Amino acid sequence: MVIDSDIYREQGVRQGQRQEPLLAVRGNIYDTKNIPLTRNIIHYSLGAHPSKVKNKSEFANLISQSTDREPDYYLKRLSSTADFVYLERNLRRDKVEGILGQRIPGLVVDRKFRRSYPHTYVGSQIIGFTDVDDNGLIGIEKEFNAFLSGTNGWVVKQVNGDGISQIKTSFPIKPPVDGANIQLTIDLEYQSILQEELARQVTNAQAKGAMGILMNPQTGAILAMATLPDFNPNLPGNSPLENQKNRTVTDQFEPGSTFKVVVATAAVATKTVSLFDEFYCEDGQFTVAGKVITDHEKFGLLTFPQIIAHSSNVGTIKIAQKLGQKPLYKYSRDFGFGTITGIRFPGEVQGVLRQTKDWSELSLAEVSIGYEVAVTALQLASAYSAIANGGVLLKPRLVKQILSPNGKVIYKENPEVIRRVASKEIMSTITDILVQVVKSGTGTKAGIQGWLIAGKTGTAHKFIDGVYSKNKYISNFAGFFPADNPQVVCVIVLDEPRSEEHTSELQSQAYLVCRLLLEKKKNK
């Protein structure tokens, strides 16, 4: 007579079965032309149930032949009293090829996917990377982790006395659901060009770092986005955390003269000035609220367009004084400053744009020339896109679409209008002024023969420990091309170039990027 036969029968069934996971494959990330930016490489881990291994010496020799590790290492592992021990982790398939087809009592082969990034540094801060459990830690990998991850399944297998399992068709199974694939708006070719040119600029200017963005002003699509120093996502532990940040969205800076387009737009839109109005620029020196504001040249009488073209601080401040606080603040907000752009990417900051009630007597002057205001490179690119496309502020986009494993579109980002900043006619006027900047003003080195380029430079002293540094700068350039039918907005930022003189060189370097892009377009 068997007592509690049902209990023993259930225990016997449990001992003869094992539920094993069926791993979902993480979705991949692609550029806008479907070039893969990620890969999933299968890695194998070897383990053993020591009590199930009949001949430990023979077992150790067999494993050693595949891994080239001494058999004694495995014999020591197999001497453990634990029910299960790992022998090797993260082996490539070629290492375990001789083992996979064999039924070896006590051996457990665990298969997992590991993320790989074939283009290493290119686009690394956009793409991000995953942890050992394949969860996204930064970048697109983190922001869209829920789409990429998929859902693991499981299968119940029959296990014999040697611990070897096999599938039985009558046993239950839950298939895995693979992750979705993401297609970005990023063009890998443009991304490579941008990063190469940023690296060249950092070297030439002996700068601390650099940022750059290429954006389609008609759609809000980000074509390229980079920060230097960068990192290799295949070896994230080899670089500082600071290098892993996409600082075009996470870091803010005072833009200096690239912000003057806000004053110009507001002045034209409110009819505060006309193209023929003249302002005396005080021979390059003007005192406001006890602070002396200077120009890079001793300008006298300049028209409104000349003030922007020659980047006169004194002239810009006089326009702002005629304009007033509220219109300047309104158009600054309308251009998207002081608030996040809404891009789907982790860590975006909103910048700094204080309400007018918090302004001092000096603030109107300072804000008009790009001080007392902090922006991100992405905000600057979005603002210049609004000028380029005829007055509409668009939400910037990094993701084109997300597709299920069978190719069905499950998420798509279309161009999204945030607001109209100004009329097409007003933005056409601002564009004409920015073309003059490149042709004859402070941006002459940015010109490309045969193409109309519109752009503006800016330089601001860095604010460190409560004071403005005398010798540390942020230099930046924002512009678009072709000016008569804008296709690309280009923003380049240099962090602490060797001297302020590198601002003019920056324009030339920024449009080397544009020149390369134009050549690519012409050759297609």
Please report, for each region that a protein language model flagged, where it lies by residue.
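Positively charged, low-complexity/disordered segments
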Residues: 505-524
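Beta-lactam-recognizing serine transpeptidase/beta-lactamase-like catalytic domain environment
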Residues: 38, 160-171, 212-257, 262-496
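Alpha-helix N-cap/helix-start and coil->helix boundary motif
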Residues: 191, 313, 325, 509-510
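Short, amphipathic alpha-helical segments that act as regulatory/interfacial helices
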Residues: 128, 384-388, 523
